[in-house]
Every structure is written in C-alpha cells, then in structure tokens.
Amino acid sequence: MEEFQRYFELDRSQQHDLLYPLIFREYIYAFAHDHGLNRSDLLENVGYDNKSSLRIVKRFITRMYRQNHLIISANDSTQNKCFGYNKNLYSQMISEGFAVIVEIPFSLRLPPSGTEIVKYYNLQSIHSIFPFLEDKFPRLNYVLDVLIPYPIHLEILVQILRYWVKDASSLHLLRLFLHEYSNWNSFITTKKSISIFSKTNPRLFLFLYNSYACEYESILLFLRNQFSHLRLTSSGVFFERIYFYGKIKHPVEEVFANDFPAIRRVFKDPFMHYVRYQGKSFLVSKDTPLLMNKWKYYLVHLWQWHFYVWAQPGRIYINLLFKHSFGFLGYLSSVRQNLSLVRSQTLENSFIMDNAIKKLDTLAPISPLIGSLAKMQFCSALGHPVSKSTWTDSSDFSIINRFARICRNLSHYYSGSSKKKNLYRIKYILRLSCVKTLACKHKSTVRVFLKRFGSELLEEFFTEEEDVLSFIFPRTYSTFRSLYRGRVWYLDIVCINDLVNQE
C-alpha cells in the first residue's frame, strides 16, 4: 500500500493559504472582466454590463475598504434577489472576481520537472474527448451511461474545496455566495437554485462542479489505471479534461486501506475506457453485464457513503454497444460493424472468412434538431419549412445573414458526423425557410421570388464548409476534400453554440 499512499499524498508546498486579500486587488476584476468579453455571443450574459470601465472597479474597491459591502442580510431578499441582477452590481463583481481567485491554487500546480504536460486554460476543454469518439472499440461490448448526481447540499462543494483552499475567510465568502441561490438551512438544494446559479455566474459554477467531479474521478480513474494493461506514465495529459494542469492527489488511502485487494479482484478489467463531459460520463468495457452491474452499484455506494450524495441506480444505464446508441456532446453515437469477406488461399485449400470491423458512428440527431427548429419557428413539428414572420421587418441582407450564420454554425459543429445526410436535411430546412421568409416580406410566392431574384442570391451566403477549406488551403484542396468527406473535429465547438449544453 505504500505505492498507493504516495500516489494520494498531498503536495503541501503547493498550497496557498492567503486568497482573501486578492479580493481587494484591481487586476483580479480585470481578469474577470476580460473573461466576460471573450465569451461567445450566443451565450447569454445575465451579469453586469461588460462595457463598464475599471473606474467602477476602483470606486468599488474604495467602498470595500471604507464599508463592509460583503455582509448581506438574509432578510434583505427583496432588495437582493440574486447576484446576477443589476440591482446589486457590487455583489456581482465580487462573485465574478472570486471565481478567478479560487482557481489560483489549481492553476499554480505545475507538473514535476522532466514531464511535459500541455496546459489548456479553458476549464471546459474537451480536446481529450475526440480520441474517444474516433476509437474503433475493437474489444468493447458494453457501455455504462452515467448521469452524475448533483450534491443535495451546497455545503458539500465547500467541504471539497477545503482540501485546497485553506483560507477560512474565502470559504465563508463562498458560503455567502451560495446562500443567495438557495436556502442554506434546507437539506436539499433544488434544481431551480442550481439553474439560477449556473446562469448567473457560470465560471464559478463550472469550477465548483469540476472540483466535485474531480474528487470522485480521482478514485474511479485510479482504479481504472491500476487494472489497465495500458498504464499511463503521465495521467495529466490524458485526463486533462478533468483536471486543470495535473492530477489532483486527494488523501483517500483510507478508502482502499482495508478492502482494496478485494476491490481490485472484483473490478479487474484491462480494457476499460472512460470519458466525461459536464454531467454525463461513460464507462465502456469488454466484460460481462455482471461486471458492469458491479461498477454501477460501486458508483452508487461511492457517491452515497463517501460524498453524501443521493444517487439513484436508475440514473445509470447498462447498454449493449451494438444495439443501443448513446447521446454525447450533442451527437448520437453508436457502434456499427462492417462485415467483409476475406479469402485465404493455401497450397491445397482456400478459406473464406468473415472479418468484422467495428466503427463508432457519430450522427447529428435529426429529431432533437427538428424539434429545436420548430421551437424557433423555422419549421413545423414534422420538419416542413415555414417562414420566420418575426424577421420580415429586417432587411434582405440581415435576414439572409441570420439564416446563413445558423447554417454555418451547425455545419461547423456537426462536421464530425460520419454521415452528412441528417445535416443536409437541416440545412435544406433553413434555406427553404429563408426563401419563404423573403417571399413573405415581398408579399409573393416562393416560385415568383426565385424567378425574380434567382437562386444565386443565397449562394453567396450559404457557403459550404468544403468551399471554406478550399479558400483557406488552395494548394492542398484535393487533400482537404478527401478529408472533409470523413470526420473533421473543430476544437472550438463548445464556443460556437450551446447545443452540447442542452442535453
């Protein structure tokens, strides 16, 4: 057990205990302000106006020195409903600045000398997920579809941070922020309170949730690494999507001290694959349903007894890869077998063998996309294009530009689809809806409008992704053309639209 105890040993020299004084530093709010400016235009900004200058910040810090603006009465709910509204500008600025401060102990954890770990400053980094989606799963049969439960009480999030943030004042301030979004005395935190918190201060919510998920995954992935034939020499690179810069070493040796040998015999699986994004994770294995059920109930007991989180076994599904598809990252994924006949010739005999090659198909989910377009009044519930009557007051250029931007974003996001048929259908709905909107504006039919202006009017704006690649790389167009027929993953798809967050 000495090896495992060293693995979970805390790096005391890396801990930083004085975070609370940073609240009075002007550059902290400049970082938070710059983070807000760099967010996607499609993400709703419900915070304060990002165009405010640092003059407001200086005035705010001066008032913090003179008065105690951090104390907010719990009975003052009528004046300060939530930090996200403009009624309490200073509290909103504190919460966004605090979100930058609590990331410092994690961001300063540099890898040991002699190792090279790529740093990704975006905490929503999904770069490690693409190799999972490109895997052929040659020996894997079952998938464990896991919905990670939320903590029933927000105090659990504060307790998790105590291992890293030793400043008691900062922890009390965090409790004050969380108190604004839920009744702290209540035993259960409602889903509505979590939703308000995630929309008002997404950076702080993302950090707290990643810290919570990281704690349980530090146990789960440690078990996975010990049983795998492909042990990793640098876990910080592969599990970058879970940890910020390196593997967080939490002292959980007491969990394995007594029953680790038994756990190792039960969960021995050399080909376990694991991936997570936000609140959904997958464990893919080649073993029997019995082992997958053991993993299922182990996760349930781990959440309930180690993290005091109520987990329902019904939120964890065991599916056969060849018969069930699973939704992940806004895609509908399933494993398909390609059968091919191979003839083997010897000196005397010849044999015909069936060779099955597995491939993970990633498709654009047609039904949810049509439902989203119908909700936005681009088509009917059956997928028939209709005119967008609310846009008829805009100019022709503005109408075409709006439709084209949606079409380009969808093409960019779903460029990783192994089959483009569903994507072409969605683009057809958007183009015909655009034509019907223009025809409605000019009080004519679609046929008359196209005869008058010609179909070339839309070609300039609805540029195919393949044509864009040919403009960027004209000399290697033939290579990119063959590449585009396959799957192309863009690393910025989370920032383009929030389809992935609507799962």
Curated annotation (Swiss-Prot):
GO biological process: mRNA processing; RNA splicing; tRNA processing
GO molecular function list: RNA binding
GO cellular component terms given for this protein: chloroplast
Primary location recorded for the protein, binned into one broad class: plastid
Pfam families for the chain: Intron_maturas2 (PF01348), MatK_N (PF01824)
Entry keyword set: Chloroplast, mRNA processing, Plastid, RNA-binding, tRNA processing
Origin superkingdom: Eukaryota
Compartments reported by the entry: Plastid, Chloroplast
Keyword Transmembrane helix attributed: no
Family, as annotated: Belongs to the intron maturase 2 family. MatK subfamily.
Function text: Usually encoded in the trnK tRNA gene intron. Probably assists in splicing its own and other chloroplast group II introns.
Protein name per its UniProtKB record: Maturase K
Organism in which the protein naturally occurs: Rhamnus cathartica (Common buckthorn)
Designated gene of the protein: matK
